[in-house]
Amino acid sequence: MSDIFEEAASFRSYQSKLGRDGRASAATATLTTKIRIFVPATNSPELRWELTLFALDVIRSPSAAESMKVGAAFTLISMYSERPGALIRSLLNDPDIEAVIIDVGSMVNGIPVMERRGDKAQEEMEGLMRILKTARDSSKGKTPFVDSRAYGLRITDMSTLVSAVITIEAQIWILIAKAVTAPDTAEESETRRWAKYVQQKRVNPFFALTQQWLTEMRNLLSQSLSVRKFMVEILIEVKKGGSAKGRAVEIISDIGNYVEETGMAGFFATIRFGLETRYPALALNEFQSDLNTIKSLMLLYREIGPRAPYMVLLEESIQTKFAPGGYPLLWSFAMGVATTIDRSMGALNINRGYLEPMYFRLGQKSARHHAGGIDQNMANRLGLSSDQVAELAAAVQETSAGRQESNVQAREAKFAAGGVLIGGSDQDIDEGEEPIEQSGRQSVTFKREMSISSLANSVPSSSVSTSGGTRLTNSLLNLRSRLAAKAAKEAASSNATDDPAISNRTQGESEKKNNQDLKPAQNDLDFVRADV
């Protein structure tokens, strides 16, 4: 039987890589689009700045074709290079486009001067002039910059040009991090990163671009795979460089840290919180299939090479194999662990159709019960004695209890999945609290089949105190006191039957109070079940 299990694991690995070997035998070439890319022929600061302004206007012009805007994006992205044309020729390898690189030696009225002469060149220059005119007319006289003085600035020294180009390119590179995964909600994170570079004095806020222009550029990045491919090639290239790098290359490399692995948070969170925590729950038979899948995906990720972190940006078809829907049980368990021990994971949207509530709660419970667990291999490397290990485990348990009491709802990601409330079950709920709603669906608290009173009375105080600590004891005592108060109210209401009006009113108030008391009782029941 061991052979079939080994073959199953090997088959998973083969299935993940199926069809990736060999070369295509059929003619799979696609139609191409011709784009014109204007690059400076010299290092003149004045020429480069005028060409930069021209590219900014083309991208915001409503009359410019998409191919024209793509060419302008290539111009802006490569402007930091000493030889932009050589950079584009060496890195551009896109079967969807045919790049025509045009060296610009001079500018007239803000447009490049064509080297060749004749009616054709004159018509092209007139077309470029119309593109600039519509860009300025559509913006009602506004410039691409927040400070309009930057648009009319005449740059003649190289230091000012470098500062301006780095600032403009930094804003473009910041856009790519969310251009594919969340373009509609990207402004907040982009603003934080821009503020970071301003605070570090790595960019000049005088050359800050308007939000309208950034929106146009973000949309272009979302639509154009060719531009993203070129940017990814630059990211891969700048990582290969040695210790001596220019300012522009350093800031591009820094932004690349945010771009890496974009769109693959579920895969890497599963590895981090599902595997590397090494909780005993991984021994469950239900997880073995997902574990084999994750193992084969990790091997495949390594085989893809340096482009693997950017597979979502590059729209590679292999990216779908890394989606959490391929290993839903292990992912659900990992998300339960993550939302319990990592505060930053509380904001991650894990409300997916393939989320398994039972394994999500199992992850939460494992993270709580195994807080303070010690890795014996690491303890042996550090030379820790048994007393030191015990003290460390006790300290972690103590701090973990305080952390959970402080903000359980935020830490454990209380949210609605499929109309059922998950997580956050071990904190007391105010009697006046309303049921939580999310995405237009009312959350439903799980029904309890076990009697509350029987469960509360069946757990000795001593066992509860030792297993769950003081917090569990107090919660159980509160539960018992509420049950006793409820019984006293029922006895009092049964004696007030002489006056029918009073009896009816008392009965209605009692039912309303009982319903309110039931919510915290159910919540405390979750707490008892989670810790006993």
Swiss-Prot record:
It comes from the Viruses. Ncore is globular and carries the regions required for self-assembly and RNA-binding. Ntail is an intrinsically disordered monomeric domain in the C-terminus. Homomultimer; forms the nucleocapsid. Binds to the viral genomic RNA. N0 interacts with the phosphoprotein (via N-terminus); this interaction allows P to chaperon N0 to avoid N polymerization before encapsidation. Interacts (via C-terminus) as N-RNA template with the phosphoprotein (via C-terminus); this interaction positions the polymerase on the template. One of its GO terms (cellular component) is host cell cytoplasm. The lineage of its organism: Viruses, Riboviria, Orthornavirae, Negarnaviricota, Haploviricotina. Changing A521T: In strain: Isolate NiV/KHM/CSUR381. GO terms for biological process: negative stranded viral RNA replication; negative stranded viral RNA transcription. Residues 427-436 have a biased composition (Acidic residues). Changing L518P: In strain: Isolate NiV/KHM/CSUR381. Residues 422-444, 487-532 are annotated as: Disordered. It comes from Nipah virus. This is Nucleoprotein. Changing M345I: In strain: Isolate NiV/MY/99/VRI-0626. Changing I502T: In strain: Isolate NiV/KHM/CSUR381. Pfam families: Paramyxo_ncap (PF00973). RNA binds at K178, R193, Y258, R352. Keywords: Capsid protein, Helical capsid protein, Host cytoplasm, Ribonucleoprotein, RNA-binding, Viral nucleoprotein, Virion.
